């Protein structure tokens, strides 16, 4: 609902300006243009509001990610490369989170609370991301004509948690500081996870075309 969105966006903006600890229900209600009773009726206390705000922002990030990464074609497309699609999705996801202005600002103001909220309290956000990734896994295997993993959701959760960990705990390897290094890591580690270990051998055999649809 429009009121819920207004409240969540007001909360995120207020958190980024003064921090979570210093944000009151009145601050959020005033910024959203609603009364305090409406805010409590919709979201209850601060913990529920914070969790809902995280999930709302995760949805916006995932929407932006889907805009940046090409869809998997329904039919044959000689120019579509599943491995490149996975590399692009991973690299863009890492970049979006690392460059996220609101997240970085909130980490500066309330680093400990954000760390807790984005780890212990990130269950719903990770589940949301995992569902999106699992759908992409199914689509990629459909396009290639290969058997998907027994449980694409497990793989979706694994990749979501991998990206989440790499972004929230930078340093110490792997090196993802440049687009080139992030793409290299995605090609050698993430692509085999998503498409199967044989993709590395297939790509090596077809260096000029990368990984296309297997011929029938």
Language model: regions and residue ranges:
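N-terminal intrinsically disordered/low-complexity leader segments
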Residues: 1-2, 72-75, 144, 196-216
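Basic, helix-initiating cap at the start of DNA-binding domains
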Residues: 1-31, 47-51, 56, 72-80, ...
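Short hydrophobic clusters on alpha-helical segments that form packing/core surfaces
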Residues: 7-15, 61, 65, 93
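Short hydrophobic/aromatic patch on the recognition helix
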Residues: 32-43
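Hydrophobic alpha-helical connector segments
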Residues: 52, 66-100, 156
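Amphipathic alpha-helical packing segments from all-alpha helical-bundle domains
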Residues: 62, 84, 105, 114-145, ...
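Amphipathic C-terminal alpha-helical segment
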Residues: 95-99, 135-139, 156-177, 189-200
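Short, hydrophobic secondary-structure boundary micro-motifs
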Residues: 103-108, 115-116, 146, 175-176, ...
């Amino acid at each position: 609902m429009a009121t819920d969105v207004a409240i969540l966006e007001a909360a995120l903006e207020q958190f980024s300006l003064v921090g979570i600890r210093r944000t009151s229900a009145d601050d959020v209600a005033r910024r959203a243009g609603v009364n305090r009773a409406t805010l409590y009726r919709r979201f209850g206390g601060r913990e529920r509001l914070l969790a809902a705000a995280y999930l709302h922002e995760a949805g916006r990030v995932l929407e932006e990610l889907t805009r940046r990464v090409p869809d998997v074609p329904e039919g044959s497309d000689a120019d579509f490369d599943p491995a490149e699609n996975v590399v692009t999705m991973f690299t863009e996801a890492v970049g979006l989170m690392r460059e996220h202005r609101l997240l970085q600002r909130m980490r500066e103001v309330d680093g400990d609370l954000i760390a807790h909220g984005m780890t212990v309290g990130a269950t719903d956000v990770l589940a949301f991301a995992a569902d999106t990734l699992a759908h992409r896994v199914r689509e990629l295997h459909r396009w290639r004509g290969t058997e998907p993993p027994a449980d694409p959701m497990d793989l979706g959760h694994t990749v979501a948690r991998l990206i989440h960990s790499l972004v929230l705990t930078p340093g110490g390897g792997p090196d993802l500081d440049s687009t080139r290094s992030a793409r290299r890591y995605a090609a050698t580690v993430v692509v085999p996870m998503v498409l199967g270990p044989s993709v590395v051998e297939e790509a090596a055999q077809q260096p000029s075309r990368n990984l296309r649809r297997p011929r029938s």
